[in-house]
């Protein structure tokens, strides 16, 4: 009888520990602009041995978030967050780290716009020349921040946008 009671208590304890809702697991990620931007870079970064963080990434974005990438000619490719996951899920994960270099935040009321320069690395401790600039739009609703969209352009020989951004005051 004691074993049965102990097993039942252990089972209930496990359920309460492991059955956290997304709100409980990721609440700290969306409490401030800094927190959500740190989570934004954290979810994409990691070693090939770490799992993708699709659930957490989805949580920090609004339901209809739009992602836009500009190619070297300025052409766009807007798509949904779910579309972003398809190529990731189809190939093995590689060591990939997006390291933020500089952030400028404009925040008015429940709206925020963030410029964020980043560098792509295969080792978090070794710098690279692969850099880009994100324009990230957020809104505050129901006690938390959401990423509504982001637009990314990579630096190239023709367009030194990250260098220009880093040199701004």
Labelled PLM ranges:
Residues 71, 116-118, 151:
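A mature extracytoplasmic/lumenal domain signature
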Residues 19-54, 59, 167-169:
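Short, low-complexity N-terminal intrinsically disordered segments enriched in polar/charged residues
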Residues 66-67, 76-124:
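Surface-exposed, charged secondary-structure patches
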Residues 78-80, 125-128, 157-164:
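A short, polar/proline- and glycine-enriched secondary-structure boundary/capping micro-motif
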Residues 40, 55-57, 65, 114, ...:
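Hydrophobic pocket/interface hotspot
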Residues 48-76:
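N-terminal, post-signal-peptide region of Sec/Tat-exported proteins
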């Amino acid at each position: 009888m004691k074993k049965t009671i102990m097993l039942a208590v252990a089972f209930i304890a496990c359920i309460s520990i492991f059955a956290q809702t997304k709100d409980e697991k990721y609440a700290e990620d969306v409490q401030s602009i800094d927190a959500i931007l740190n989570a934004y870079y954290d979810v994409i970064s990691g070693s090939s041995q770490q799992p993708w963080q699709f659930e957490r990434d989805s949580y920090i974005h609004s339901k209809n978030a739009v992602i836009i990438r500009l190619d070297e000619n300025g052409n766009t490719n807007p798509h949904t967050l779910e579309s972003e996951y398809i190529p990731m899920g189809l190939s093995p994960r590689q060591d990939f780290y997006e390291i933020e270099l500089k952030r400028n935040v404009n925040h008015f009321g429940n709206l925020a716009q963030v410029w964020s320069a980043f560098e792509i690395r295969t080792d978090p401790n070794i710098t690279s020349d692969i850099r880009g600039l994100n324009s990230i739009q957020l809104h505050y609703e129901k006690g938390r921040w959401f990423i509504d969209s982001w637009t990314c352009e990579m630096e190239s020989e023709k367009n030194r946008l990250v260098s220009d951004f880093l040199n701004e005051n």
